[in-house]
Amino acid sequence: MKYVGAHVSASGGLANAAIRAAEIEATAFALFTKNQRQWRAAPLSDETIAEFKAACEKYHFGPGQILPHDSYLINLGHPVEEALEKSRDAFIDEMTRCQQLGLTLLNFHPGSHLQQIPEEECLARIAESINIALAKTEGVTAVIENTAGQGSNLGFKFEHLAAIIDGVEDKSRVGVCIDTCHAFAAGYDLRSAEACEKTFAAFERIVGFQYLRGMHLNDAKSAFGSRVDRHHSLGEGNIGHDCFSWIMQDSRFDGIPLILETINPDIWAEEIAWLRAQQIAEVA
């Protein structure tokens, strides 16, 4: 079964994220459990936790259908020790919040070397950051998102994801989320069913579908291989419709959150309905 939704706002209370997801007839959703542009947040109250769990139960969202995202400030591969520790502490807090909310996944951008340390050292720092967080939490899987490769961000090659996973001690609690816009911008072609087959064959060979815990379904304003992260509405960008039809018809993408981060929230309900319809359509 395909779980399809969008990254919805938790404004006014975390429970509202589940309500907003239900309003667009989603069967999955993503959210921030705190302000994504601040380091600190007040601890979750018992009331907030209870309200969130009740809303998820009411609208039939299980933990495997929800893909929380951490703060954009966190850099688990930071070259400077003091800044690295700050990021690690913040990541542990994000994992703990997920644990308190009964969630089992936490999606994050791997990190950046800031042109100060070699790629290999940065990847090793990211893996060690994950190890530290997993040791201090329970039941939550760290889900590494591939990146477009802007600036000094790592994670734009499948090999980066594989290297991080290789350094994580508890393989049962690490996974990946593939963002289609990021992959396309990083040089993985998705413009046809044939291109998708080739790209995901490479993913299977290098990373493995057993680690796929979620997807971000985004078209791309940015050009192929541009290393620029610019999302677009489905079918309106440089990837086109075929990729998303192909994903909806492939059982390897069953049972994980498929999350829209497309640029027009007003048409998320339409995009979700279109994606569902592709399950019985044929790629042209």
Swiss-Prot record:
Its cofactor is Zn(2+). Zn(2+) 1 binds at residues 69, 109, 145. Coiled coil: none annotated. Pfam families: AP_endonuc_2 (PF01261). It catalyses: Endonucleolytic cleavage to 5'-phosphooligonucleotide end-products. Belongs to the AP endonuclease 2 family. This is Probable endonuclease 4. It comes from Klebsiella pneumoniae subsp. pneumoniae (strain ATCC 700721 / MGH 78578). The lineage of its organism: Bacteria, Pseudomonadati, Pseudomonadota, Gammaproteobacteria, Enterobacterales. The gene is nfo.
